[in-house]
């Protein structure tokens, strides 16, 4: 192992000089051990990642933690490989930082645990799975109108308090319970409070045992926030490649991954490109996204929360992400105001999988008819607001009546929200979802009150609820 010396510290950027031409490779992890002021840890260890070889035996590195206490002249050791993180079933139920160290104050991991490098090649062309298989979530609005593909990439758009976290928890719960699947959650630039809340909520709902969590919090240096997504992905890849599992990878927030990359790029002195972003934006995004895919032995399906700066979808950060997405799930605040949960906008959400070749003719026809009906209802809302329902034609009155039932039937009780709602959660298979909406569109349930359709699972639950309301079914 070659050794060097710190010659310059500029915030999270550290320059290191090595003697005798023993320069570490790009992405190699370097370690500095130094005395700390903290009583509980008299020596601190700082990990650096090599970013640029400057010449004259000097490398420029990015720190993965605070550089407080680092001085010129300190000894630096080249580990000889990129950052490695723990992988395997031992990671389930645990919380890690970017370096794969546990931060949940639980039992330490065994010393002989397997570790993988966070920088890896994407699967080769011949390893990719050629089938397009739907990932059943048990959530009606998703399965019917914007179905997810196994090994696909889904963008989850939504503001604060519209139900992103609850939707994420339910997806983790359903895949863990119904499919026995593994989930990995990567908090990228995450608020510490949000990550803390999510951990305890998942612990209470019992899904933590099937989940590995990785956090690079908002207060950490940009190097940690940029690499933490790769740490989560590396853990997920192991379950796909070695355990042959279908894995769900959540990244919140992919915009903060881009933002951290932009900060690092500026610190390294690169010339910025459009809107001040890094010139390597598309490359960095591609390196991450291309590793999230289905192979012949398993799949990594990614659900990514995406912040859109100033609601500008042409901003380079979301625009670059769009190129990689197979489906988008848009959460709408207006629906939460109506008490419709999950508040997924059925008209704005899209999916590449919604085609007759993938979901089948019947599913496709029912989904497009639902969208057509809801679009017509949206067009009529202005007229209703000004003139009232009486001014509509009989056909439009029927459309509005059915559209409202459809809208309410797209809502659903969640297992992870049982403690708040007092109502049992429901998992609805795709076949039952399609049949329920097909009968609803055909007018079979026009006599059932609208409220019977709100926050239920199967169509049988609607009929049961209607009976309780004293309606003949």
UniProtKB/Swiss-Prot annotation:
Report which reactions are catalysed by this protein: ATP + H2O + 4 H(+)(in) = ADP + phosphate + 5 H(+)(out)
How this chain sits in the membrane, per its record, is: Peripheral membrane protein
InterPro entries, sorted: AAA+_ATPase, ATP-synt_VA_C, ATP_synth_F1_bsu, ATPase_a/bsu_AS, ATPase_alpha/beta_chains, ATPase_F1/V1/A1_a/bsu_N, ATPase_F1/V1/A1_a/bsu_N_sf, ATPase_F1/V1/A1_a/bsu_nucl-bd
Compartmental location? Cell membrane
Q: Which Gene3D superfamilies match?
A: 2.40.10.170, Bovine Mitochondrial F1-atpase, Atp Synthase Beta Chain, Chain D, domain 3, P-loop containing nucleotide triphosphate hydrolases
Query: Which EC class, in a word?
Result: translocase
Q: What is its EC number?
A: 7.1.2.2
Residues bound to ATP are: 158-165
GO MF assignments: ATP binding; ATP hydrolysis activity; proton-transporting ATP synthase activity, rotational mechanism
Q: Which GO terms describe its cellular component?
A: plasma membrane; proton-transporting ATP synthase complex
Keyword Membrane found: yes
Q: What UniProt keywords are attached to this protein's entry?
A: ATP synthesis, ATP-binding, Cell membrane, CF(1), Hydrogen ion transport, Ion transport, Membrane, Nucleotide-binding, Translocase, Transport
Identify the PROSITE patterns for this entry.
ATPASE_ALPHA_BETA
Q: Which Pfam families match?
A: ATP-synt_ab, ATP-synt_ab_N, ATP-synt_VA_C
Self-association or partners: how does it assemble? F-type ATPases have 2 components, CF(1) - the catalytic core - and CF(0) - the membrane proton channel. CF(1) has five subunits: alpha(3), beta(3), gamma(1), delta(1), epsilon(1). CF(0) has three main subunits: a(1), b(2) and c(9-12). The alpha and beta chains form an alternating ring which encloses part of the gamma chain. CF(1) is attached to CF(0) by a central stalk formed by the gamma and epsilon chains, while a peripheral stalk is formed by the delta and b chains.
State the similarity comment.
Belongs to the ATPase alpha/beta chains family.
Quote the NCBIfam families the UniProt record gives.
Answer: atpD
Record's function text = Produces ATP from ADP in the presence of a proton gradient across the membrane. The catalytic sites are hosted primarily by the beta subunits.
The entry's protein name is ATP synthase subunit beta 2
Record lineage:
Bacteria, Bacillati, Bacillota, Bacilli, Bacillales
